[in-house]
């Protein structure tokens, strides 16, 4: 009996001790994903005395030190976390290296107030590792091409395609007018950049740097105007991408469609060292809807600075390109440089008046990822003065249908006497207005804004002094800017003044509302600088904090820009510019986005559904107004078809 009792006592103690010493476990399913965007489920159990500060870290490459995670999630996002077990599902991007996942215990007493992320939240501690998963792989491996995006070249019957793969083995594009017969091919040039090319931390630190893979660049040639082409990139030995398609550019087209915005960034399914942009998901979603509605009409996208907001954390570029691939692989994706791609402490051009303007917003990238991951038309470049390769894609232009598009850099020298100024001058003076009656200039930092961006006051003054006379003299139709994360439309303006009659004054729009959610306040009233009193100046015709993008539609007679809001995908502001010089201010009245397959560029945007009687009544009223307006316009413009004078019909609106 005594022996039996001792046996059971020993068994009880051993079971108790075993239970007390049990370790947390973590598993993943599946252990291999096919492509970027596929999801993995991470499950854990055995977490004793769980805390709402316990967290899950994502690591790639898998041998990364504990504090070199790419992102994290708190375990309390699972509904069962208090019971010591749970699961989280995460869509992941192929970083050309395996992932692993680790669970940590973290307590309030271990919070380091000096160790914070971009939002000033304390970064989680890594002192107590509870469990680590097996490695997660991508079935496509490092060789499969991803991050596919298109752009125009200097030749009108071509289309550039760029993509990323994990090794430098030769890749190709094959293309044709049928997805079943990709009979044309071209070899792609591979290139890469190294950690030593970065100019500061975090880009050149062990935390921010990740291998960017190989960037491939090739051109599809001898394209027929306005024809849909199918293509895929890759190689027989490493694998081919899915088949994508696009509509070739037609410079003689009678209609132009473009989707334009700035400061979009990207979203990540985890929290990381820097702020990411959840609103960018909606921006991409609505633009994809509009592209699909176009059918076989060509279009393009213009992203005017602050592209990914990686700011030195390399993998954020991968997240960005994975997010935009559905649209960037279908229409050309054009960019200009912003402060968050470029600015660094030793940048070559930093005059005394700009010492407080050009800081370290590039996170040590000094324009390198931007310069190599994109290849825009033209050959503009500036030396960085360091090991980094020259900064490219600074200023360039091209025609698309009825519009001449110009891109400029506000981060490098734009003053008189500089190479960029001379390019802008020559380019604007050489535009054939019979071929392209409308000219659209785009840059990152705005020439005009009514936000309280006092730091950029001097650069705005310099832009007005040096660039605005070129815009006015050469009858620029529209100037688009980002940097301020709001939408704002100005009257046709020159020297901060608008009246009733001008000669060629451009309309300025700030369109930095595509994703970044840090928003400055509007300019307060001078005698109440510390109170939320924000009068809207007369020059500002419409402004809002709503996220979204702009849609440009132009034919030979009219260019229309509409602001589409992300919360409903509908138009919230519209402005029309006629080839004759007349500018018609729009309204904040929300209108449904037309089906671009069937609605011509000149069509009036239809409002929300209403009764037939009311619709016909409004229609009759519009016809009367249209006749009167046509008579007035005809009276003042008869015999003066070449006049560039602008007449502005103002309607002033604001959304807050």
Swiss-Prot record:
Q: Which residues hold Zn(2+)?
A: 306, 339, 444, 483
The coiled-coil regions, if any, are none
Locations listed in the record: Secreted
Tissue specificity of this protein: Expressed in roots, stems, leaves, flowers and siliques.
Q: Which UniProt keywords apply?
A: Glycoprotein, Iron, Metal-binding, Secreted, Signal, Zinc
The Gene Ontology CC terms held by the record are: chloroplast; chloroplast envelope; endosome; extracellular region; Golgi apparatus; mitochondrial envelope; mitochondrion; trans-Golgi network
Q: Which Gene Ontology terms cover its molecular function?
A: acid phosphatase activity; metal ion binding; mitochondrion targeting sequence binding
Signal peptide residues are 1-19
InterPro entries in the cross-refs: Calcineurin-like_PHP_ApaH (IPR004843), Metallo-depent_PP-like (IPR029052), MPP_PAP (IPR041792), Purple_acid_Pase-like_N (IPR008963), Purple_acid_Pase_N (IPR015914), Purple_acid_PPase_C_dom (IPR025733)
Q: Which domain of life is it from?
A: Eukaryota
Which residues are involved in binding Fe cation? Answer: 306, 309, 485
The glycosylation sites are 34, 76, 98, 204, 379, 475, 495
- Give the GO terms filed under biological process for this record: protein insertion into mitochondrial outer membrane; protein targeting to mitochondrion; regulation of carbohydrate metabolic process
Cofactor info, note text: Binds 1 Fe cation per subunit. Binds 1 zinc ion per subunit.
Tell me its cofactors. Answer: Fe cation; Zn(2+)
Is the keyword DNA damage assigned to this protein? Answer: no
User: Which CDD domains does the entry mention?
Assistant: MPP_PAPs
Entry keyword annotation includes Manganese = no
Oligomeric and partner information: Homodimer.
Member of which family? Answer: Belongs to the metallophosphoesterase superfamily. Purple acid phosphatase family.
Q: What is this protein called?
A: Probable inactive purple acid phosphatase 2
Organism name = Arabidopsis thaliana
The primary gene name is PAP2
């Amino acid at each position: 009996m005594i022996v039996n009792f001792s046996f059971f006592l020993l068994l009880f103690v051993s079971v108790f001790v075993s239970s007390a010493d049990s370790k947390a476990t973590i598993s993943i399913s599946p252990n291999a994903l096919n492509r970027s965007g596929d999801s993995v489920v991470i499950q854990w159990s055995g977490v004793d005395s769980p805390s709402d500060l316990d967290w899950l870290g994502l690591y790639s490459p898998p041998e990364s030190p504990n504090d070199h995670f790419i992102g994290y999630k708190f375990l309390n996002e699972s509904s069962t976390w208090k019971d010591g077990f749970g699961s989280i599902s995460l869509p992941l991007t192929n970083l050309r290296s395996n992932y692993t996942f680790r669970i940590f215990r973290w307590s309030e007493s271990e919070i380091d107030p000096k160790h914070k992320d971009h939002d000033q939240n304390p970064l989680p501690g890594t002192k107590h590792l509870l469990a680590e998963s097996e490695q997660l792989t991508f079935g496509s491996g490092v060789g499969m091409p991803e991050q596919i995006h298109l752009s125009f070249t200097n030749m009108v019957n071509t289309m550039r395609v760029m993509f990323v793969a994990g090794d430098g083995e030769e890749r190709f594009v094959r293309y044709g007018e049928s997805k079943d017969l990709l009979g044309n091919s071209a070899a792609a040039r591979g290139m890469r950049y190294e950690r030593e090319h970065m100019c500061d931390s975090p880009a050149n630190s062990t935390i921010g740097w990740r291998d960017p893979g190989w960037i491939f660049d090739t051109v599809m040639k001898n394209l027929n105007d306005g024809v849909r082409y199918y293509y895929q990139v890759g190689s027989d030995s490493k694998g081919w991408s899915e088949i994508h398609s696009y509509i070739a550019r037609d410079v003689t087209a009678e209609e132009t469609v473009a989707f334009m915005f700035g400061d979009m960034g990207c979203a990540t399914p985890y929290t990381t060292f820097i702020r990411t942009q959840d609103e960018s998901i909606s921006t991409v979603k609505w633009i994809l809807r509009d592209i699909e509605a176009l059918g076989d009409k060509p279009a393009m996208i213009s992203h005017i600075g602050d592209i990914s907001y990686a700011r030195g954390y390399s993998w954020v570029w991968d997240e960005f390109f994975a997010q935009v691939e559905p649209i960037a692989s279908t229409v050309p994706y054009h960019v200009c440089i912003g402060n968050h791609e470029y600015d660094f402490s030793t940048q070559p051009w930093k005059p005394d008046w700009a010492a407080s303007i050009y800081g370290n917003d590039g996170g040590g990238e000094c324009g390198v990822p931007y310069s190599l991951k994109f290849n825009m038309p033209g050959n503009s470049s500036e030396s960085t003065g360091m090991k980094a390769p020259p900064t490219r894609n600074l200023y360039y232009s091209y025609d698309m249908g009825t519009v001449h598009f110009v891109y400029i850099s506000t981060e490098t020298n734009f003053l008189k006497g500089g190479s960029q100024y001379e390019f802008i001058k020559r380019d604007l003076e050489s535009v054939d207005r019979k071929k392209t009656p409308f000219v659209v200039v785009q840059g990152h930092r705005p020439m005009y804004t009514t936000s309280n961006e006092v730091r950029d006051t001097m650069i705005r003054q310099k832009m007005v002094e040096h660039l605005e006379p070129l815009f006015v003299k050469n009858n620029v139709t529209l100037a688009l800017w980002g940097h301020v994360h709001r939408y704002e439309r100005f009257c046709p303006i020159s020297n901060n003044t608008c009246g009733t009659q001008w000669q060629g004054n451009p309309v300025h729009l700030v369109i930095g509302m595509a994703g970044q959610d840090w928003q400055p306040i509007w300019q307060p009233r001078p005698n109440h600088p510390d109170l939320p009193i924000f009068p809207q100046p007369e020059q500002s015709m419409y402004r809002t904090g709503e996220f979204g993008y702009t849609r440009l539609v132009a034919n030979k007679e009219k260019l229309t820009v509409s602001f589409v809001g992300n919360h409903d995908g509908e138009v919230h502001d519209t402005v029309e510019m006629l080839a004759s010089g007349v500018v018609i201010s729009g309204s904040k009245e929300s209108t449904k986005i037309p089906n671009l397959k069937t609605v011509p560029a000149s069509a009036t945007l239809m409002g929300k559904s209403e009764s037939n009687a009311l619709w016909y009544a409004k229609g009759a009223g519009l016809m009367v107004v249209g006749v009167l307006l046509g008579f007035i316009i005809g009276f003042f413009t008869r015999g003066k078809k070449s006049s560039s004078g602008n007449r502005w019909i103002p309607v002033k609106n604001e959304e807050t």
